[in-house]
Amino acid sequence: LNATDLSFTIDVDSEEVFNLGGRVELSGIKNGEIQAFNMAGSTSDKYGQIFGAPTDGSLKNINITGLDFGNLLAAVAMEDEQLLLAELQTGFGVTAVSIDGLVANIADLKAKLTSGKIEIADNVIENFSLTDFGFTDTDEEIALDIGKAQFKGLNLGFDFLSEKAVIENATQFYGLTEIGIYDVSYTIEGNEFGIDDLSLTDVALDSGFLVKSTLNANGIRIPIELIAEMDRSVARSIENFTDSESFTLSFSNSNDFNTEDGTYDVNLSLGVEGFAAIKINAAYAGLDFQRLRRVYKSEDFIEMMDGLSKIGEELSMSSVYFEYTDDQLADVILSQVPDVKQLVMMSDMQIDMFLSQYPDQADQLKASIKAFLEGTNTFKVSMNAEAEVKIMDIPDLFVSGDMTNSILVAFEGN
């Protein structure tokens, strides 16, 4: 079924006040199923005679594959909640949807979408994406722009009416393996919130545990004006540091738990524009996954705490890395110090006392701190175990003076 060059107009006093036009294509129609549905068109309601407000919009193309139209109509007509839910779980038979070039303007409301796609298979939304979405409410002074948004792996195949099923699937992230939103700008009354990149990827679960993931949150912008409403002095300090109308921070975290051999790697970074950034990487071993599962499932508090204690006793360190990178924070703080050389001398004395059994490491740390205070750039600490060292044994190793026989410690500053 093809209908092209469709057009419907309403004229008042020889003036066109409403127009609706476009095309519709249907193929593979059988037993209430439509194999393919394709549509494009535009509409204009100049004075709001039909839609209640001045409206104009256009759609370059929408394509739907595999729509089970019969069951959808039956569920709605019969008000059958179970049938409607069952059809929702299967996506009404739809396997793919694509939208291109959507524009809608209703009075002071404006929306646009360059493209959108959905792919569904076996009750799972395998891919959902939006590109170049925008919404504006000029009356409320609100504007939202999203460069790209996407997610993968959303599971629709469970009972939405069952609280237990909803909770169980929530612990499994509803099957999601990737979520991302990029180049976001939200402006209200002249104040802009922004996100360069907010994403969760590489998601893997085992028995309800998140054993692998990568979280990135980059370029999170918060307007200084909003902070000023809570604390003006803090807002002024931030503005002096950043010389910007926004407080911008970035955060990332990745973890990888090998449930077979008990190794656990974690990487964490946090940065604030105009201030500083830190990075922490750590590798652990001896993390008993089966014991962790039993602790997670235990409803006995004492049993749970005992299990956690045993896990802590067996947990070992392979390596730890810390890095501090300065932007302006150290410069500003040191500008308030009357005598930096005296600060270095006092620091040297404290280090000599604390690391009296480790003179080589003490000298390296003193040199690194001195270099950092002079360069105010980066300061790094690394600890690498020659063989896995139980974390609970580290304090005793340090006191004994034998720690460097098991763990290589290094400092660097510039």
Which residues does each predicted region cover?
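Glycine-rich, small/hydroxylated-residue low-complexity segments
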Residues: 1-414
